[in-house]
């Protein structure tokens, strides 16, 4: 794809391709619209057609992250916005497929406590919406939470999972999947090979929150075996967990309560999002 200077999406929009932002399983390019300024304000994610995660992500954007559905959902609840990107284009070549979203800024790195509290509320709102549509995100980690102009965006929907089987019954807990993702933020269920459920998304968000509030994850730089062992042990001894995350004893009580509530959720249980959200709403 490096040899291409531009390409057209399925609606005929022309996208001029700039520098590579990231190269891994998929490739991210800076892109801009034709006949606009010289600034590359968009990002194109591209991969080979045989790569199923990108296809799944495109389908998720189309079928679940519908702007009208999001608008209705937020208006009914009096929510300003959800941390969900808008989709600006989808396309394919003979061998590749791609989609285009706005350049959503940098990884969220809060500078004050107020911004952390706001981020916690926004992310709980966003996960509640995704869960209400019958899916989990499955890959909550800091690098997937971006900020631009004080607005958060949750990206990377390549590992979403359906919550329900036919007949609207919750998926069963089975440890039969190959795990993938950043082991530092992975939920215990995913470590063990189970599909990420609602509690898993919220658990992963909790690990992000710990770092946002200035704590450290005690299993950083450990092997995957040691990481899962520590996480399972810490779930039994939450006080010890926070002593190790915040050695100076400055852990926020709101965060401690959040982790306590999330750790007690059953695999198929519907979380009390309002209770979790209220922990971080400041008067």
UniProtKB/Swiss-Prot annotation:
Compartment list: Host nucleus
Q: Which residues form the Protein kinase domain?
A: 1-283
Please give the InterPro entries that the UniProt record associates with this protein: CK1_Ser-Thr_kinase, Kinase-like_dom_sf, Prot_kinase_dom, Ser-Thr/Tyr_kinase_cat_dom
Query: Which SUPFAM superfamilies would you find in this protein's record?
Result: Protein kinase-like (PK-like)
Which keywords does this Swiss-Prot/TrEMBL entry list? ATP-binding, Early protein, Host nucleus, Nucleotide-binding
Q: Which Pfam families match?
A: PK_Tyr_Ser-Thr
- State if ATP-binding is listed as a keyword: yes
Tell me which residues bind ATP. 1, 30
**Per the record, what phenotype accompanies loss of this gene's function?**
Deletion mutants exhibit rescued DNA replication and viral yield in multiple cell lines when B1 kinase/VPK1 is deleted.
Instruction: Give the regulation of activity.
Output: Both catalytically active kinases B1/VPK1 and host VRK2 repress B12 inhibitory activity in a B1/VPK1 deletion mutant strain.
**Gene Ontology CC annotations of this record:** host cell nucleus
**Binding partners and assembly:** Interacts with B1/VPK1. Interacts with host VRK1. Interacts with host VRK2.
What is the purpose of this protein? Answer: Pseudokinase that plays a role in viral DNA replication repression by activating the antiviral protein BANF1 and inhibiting the activity of host VRK1, a cellular modulator of BANF1.
Entry's family note: Belongs to the protein kinase superfamily. Ser/Thr protein kinase family. Poxviruses subfamily.
Name of this chain's protein = Pseudokinase OPG198
The UniProt gene name for this protein comes to: OPG198
